[in-house]
Regions:
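Short, membrane-interfacial amphipathic segments enriched in basic
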Residues: 7-52, 228-229, 233
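Active-site cofactor/substrate anionic-group-binding motifs, chiefly glycine-
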Residues: 58-112, 116
Length: 269
């Protein structure tokens, strides 16, 4: 039987394991930064794969409208139903449209939309590129004089950068409509009156930062999804690992960007 380890030796092993994990984290972060640098280098060089960019926009945008719309509708309806009793106690029913619009536009809409894109789009890109890496299709593209990075990574990342803001606006509008229907369960309000009241509470400082950060959300969703798939190891199980890690890493990046955006907006106000 192997000799038992004393507490000092056990602690030393744990520290060594943690240090190894920390080194892997910083190595992956540096590799991701280099991957992003390669993206910015290639995205500024024409010609562009317009056909592939439009096709990826179709997959990212149009194919996600039902899920994004359904989520936005439920989000707006639940927010209205949950807050109405508290607002009614203070006689502030008329403030519900403004409260919903500010909450959805500033924070809930962009973040929820980005997280859905992480799960639906980021995982698809990670699995798709991971499968191509495992089956050596990327190597075949390099041999055939096609730039695989430009064709696979640049097009997909540009599509997410362009479509996530549009999906966010779409989700916000559907959420307001869901809030309107939920409000009419107990109260009577016209659609025009509800939207006028909702928009009257929105200011430039509410809308502009929310739209700007969605471009960054789209960037990290596309880039991290492609990065995980591009660096998948040989073997079929690595495809699933690439898809899973793409969702986790991009979701974490969304929360970090959202926190930084909130701090910057607070400093500018």
């Amino acid at each position: 039987m192997p000799p038992s380890l004393n507490p000092y030796q056990k602690a030393k092993i744990r520290v060594t394991e943690k240090r190894s994990e920390l080194q892997k984290f910083f190595y992956a972060a540096g590799d991701l930064v280099a991957f992003a640098g390669r993206f910015f280098r290639d995205v500024l060089k024409p010609p562009y794969e317009w056909r592939e960019i439009l096709y990826q926009c179709f997959l990212v945008g149009y194919k996600s409208t039902f899920l994004i719309g359904l989520t936005g509708f439920i989000m707006g309806a639940v927010l209205t139903i949950q807050t109405r009793p508290s607002m009614a106690q203070f006689g502030a029913i008329s403030m519900i449209p403004g409260m919903i619009s500010v909450s959805v536009v500033r924070e809930i809409g962009p973040v929820i939309t980005a997280l859905i894109c992480c799960g639906k789009i980021g995982s698809r890109m990670g699995a798709e590129l991971g499968s191509m890496k495992v089956t050596e299709q990327i190597d075949a593209m390099e041999v055939s004089a096609i730039n695989p990075f430009r064709y696979l990574v640049v097009t997909r990342t540009l599509a997410t950068i362009l479509m996530v803001p549009l999906l966010t606006i779409y989700s916000d509008l559907i959420a307001l409509f869901g809030g309107y229907l939920a409000m009419n369960i107990h109260d009577t309000s016209t659609l025009r009156h509800f939207f006028v009241a909702a928009m009257s509470h929105l200011e430039f400082i509410d809308v502009f930062p929310a739209i700007i950060k969605t471009f960054f959300f789209g960037f990290v969703v596309g880039l991290i999804g492609c990065y995980k798939g591009w660096n998948a190891r040989r073997g079929t199980e690595s495809v699933g690992m690439a898809a899973n890690s793409a969702v986790v890493a991009s979701s974490l990046a969304v929360f970090v960007i959202d926190m930084l955006a909130a701090q910057i907006t607070d400093l500018l106000v």
